[in-house]
């Protein structure tokens, strides 16, 4: 009996992905544990292993295909003793026949069984003057063989929000409607409802601009970054606290540590020490090591620090788990491994999903100070500015010191200003008296 190879769920939250590359071809024999393909999620490219043995009879989804729903059949394998060509032919016919039936069914029921538009949504679109645009969208789809192409996730979201798929312009392959299209349509309608007399072309993702330009399609990662940061700024009331921290003692200790660790080929970075200081400060102020969760607050018993790492096409935050318990040398080695895998796109979901707080360091770019956006569902993030030589008062005397400006962003729903201040004070003390970092 033939074996269906389905799009895997490579993380608990994955609903769709991109089939980045096939590592096998039709006719190849495979065994359990062999890698079939590379799947791109919103944060990484991951290898997909088969759990069955057989021969690849037919590849149904070509590499490079985007927005492939979890559970969709992407290939068919023939078991030992089966006629490979017969399995391939059967797979091909099964693809075309349901498609033809769906076309006929769609044509017969298009007028009588379309998803109704919620009255308020319809009114919002009408008030904002989107009537002509909607008619054009509907006409364009009616001209296309009478069938609307949409992903299963998009269909569920449309049904839940009473959106007529005929009014949505698909941005997926061959005009296929994907989840992002439904979300954009709903956002546009909501914007129209709140500003009925104002034309907002930006809401639809179509900006009119006379300046010569290139249109660059957003990657999966960039779309997720855009969505999550928008959610953060819209839903989380940020409070910002800033401190100036003298770095000289920490820099001196780092130099001494690296001299002694050189024989082990370990080099501790300033960021490694700041991560450890952040973790210890979180343990010292448990009211900050928390997360907002609807009608409850989660208080964490360990400090898992998400570290912002710049990668091609965006940003990812690998996690140093239990950073408060790790030695500086162990923390440094693990961090370098995580950064390397992050830039190769080889992180596993459990290595970047979660965390109790984040840190973002832009000091190496000469940035003096910035406010970082909280990474939900976390409730805090540290923004590290560059260390620079500044006048500094010590014992009523002015001297020159290396000083960095560091800003903490906190979720004011669960973190009070006084608790945030206590955390920043604890962090500052650990950096300026860095032996405390080694002692814990």
Swiss-Prot record:
Any one GO MF annotation of this record: dihydrolipoyllysine-residue acetyltransferase activity
Compositionally biased region (Polar residues): 192-202
UniProtKB keywords: Acyltransferase, Lipoyl, Transferase
Domain Lipoyl-binding: 2-78
Domain named Peripheral subunit-binding (PSBD): residues: 149-186
Reaction equation(s) it catalyzes: N(6)-[(R)-dihydrolipoyl]-L-lysyl-[protein] + acetyl-CoA = N(6)-[(R)-S(8)-acetyldihydrolipoyl]-L-lysyl-[protein] + CoA
Domain of life: Bacteria
Cofactors: (R)-lipoate
Stretches the record annotates as Disordered: 91-113, 192-214
Cofactor note: Binds 1 lipoyl cofactor covalently.
Record's keyword annotation contains Thylakoid: no
Coiled-coil portions: none
Entry's EC annotation: 2.3.1.12
UniProt xrefs under PROSITE patterns: BIOTINYL_LIPOYL, LIPOYL, PSBD
GO cellular component: a single term: pyruvate dehydrogenase complex
Quaternary structure note: Forms a 24-polypeptide structural core with octahedral symmetry.
PANTHER family noted in UniProt: DIHYDROLIPOAMIDE ACETYL/SUCCINYL-TRANSFERASE-RELATED, DIHYDROLIPOYLLYSINE-RESIDUE ACETYLTRANSFERASE COMPONENT OF PYRUVATE DEHYDROGENASE COMPLEX, MITOCHONDRIAL-RELATED
Function as written in the Swiss-Prot or TrEMBL entry: The pyruvate dehydrogenase complex catalyzes the overall conversion of pyruvate to acetyl-CoA and CO(2). It contains multiple copies of three enzymatic components: pyruvate dehydrogenase (E1), dihydrolipoamide acetyltransferase (E2) and lipoamide dehydrogenase (E3).
Name this protein carries in UniProt: Dihydrolipoyllysine-residue acetyltransferase component of pyruvate dehydrogenase complex
Organism encoding this protein: Zymomonas mobilis subsp. mobilis (strain ATCC 31821 / ZM4 / CP4)
Gene (name only): pdhC
């Amino acid at each position: 009996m033939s074996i269906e190879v389905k799009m895997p769920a490579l993380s608990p939250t994955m609903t769709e992905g991109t089939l980045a590359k096939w590592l096998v071809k039709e006719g190849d024999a495979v065994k359990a544990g062999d890698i079939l393909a590379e799947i791109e999620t919103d944060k990484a490219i991951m290898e997909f292993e088969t759990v069955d043995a057989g021969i690849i009879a037919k590849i149904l989804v070509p590499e490079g295909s985007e927005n492939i729903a979890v559970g969709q059949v992407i290939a068919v394998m023939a078991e030992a003793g089966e006629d490979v060509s017969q399995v391939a032919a059967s797979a091909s016919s099964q693809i075309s026949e349901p498609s033809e039936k769906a076309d006929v069914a769609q044509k017969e029921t298009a007028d009588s069984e379309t998803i109704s538009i919620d009255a308020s949504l319809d009114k919002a679109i009408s008030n904002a003057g989107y009537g002509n645009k909607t008619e054009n969208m509907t006409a364009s789809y009616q001209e296309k063989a009478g069938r609307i192409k949409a992903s299963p996730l998009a269909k569920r979201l449309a049904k839940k929000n009473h959106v007529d798929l005929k009014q949505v312009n698909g941005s997926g392959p061959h005009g296929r409607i994907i989840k992002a299209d439904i979300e954009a349509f709903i956002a546009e309608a909501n914007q129209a409802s709140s500003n009925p007399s104002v034309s907002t072309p930006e809401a639809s993702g179509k900006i009119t601009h006379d300046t010569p330009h290139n249109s660059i399609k957003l990657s999966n990662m960039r779309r997720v970054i855009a969505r999550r940061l928008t959610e953060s700024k819209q839903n989380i009331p940020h409070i910002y606290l800033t401190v100036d921290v003298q770095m000289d003692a920490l820099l001196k200790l780092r130099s001494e540590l690296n001299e002694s660790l050189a024989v082990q080929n370990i080099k501790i970075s300033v960021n490694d020490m700041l991560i450890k200081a952040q973790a210890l400060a979180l343990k010292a102020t448990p009211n900050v090591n928390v997360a907002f969760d609807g009608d409850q607050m989660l208080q964490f018993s360990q400090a898992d620090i998400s570290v912002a790492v710049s990668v091609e096409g965006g940003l990812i935050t690998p996690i140093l788990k239990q950073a408060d318990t790790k030695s500086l040398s162990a923390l440094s080695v693990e961090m370098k491994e995580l950064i390397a895998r992050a830039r190769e796109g080889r992180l596993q979901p459990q290595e970047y999903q979660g965390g109790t707080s984040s840190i973002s360091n832009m000091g190496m770019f000469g940035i003096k100070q910035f406010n970082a956006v909280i990474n939900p569902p976390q409730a805090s993030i540290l923004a590290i500015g560059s260390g620079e030589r500044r006048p500094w008062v010590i014992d009523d005397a002015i001297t020159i010191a290396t000083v960095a400006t560091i800003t903490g962003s906190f979720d004011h729903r669960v973190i009070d200003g006084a608790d945030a201040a206590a955390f920043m004070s604890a962090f500052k003390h650990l950096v300026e008296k860095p032996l405390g970092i080694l002692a814990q």
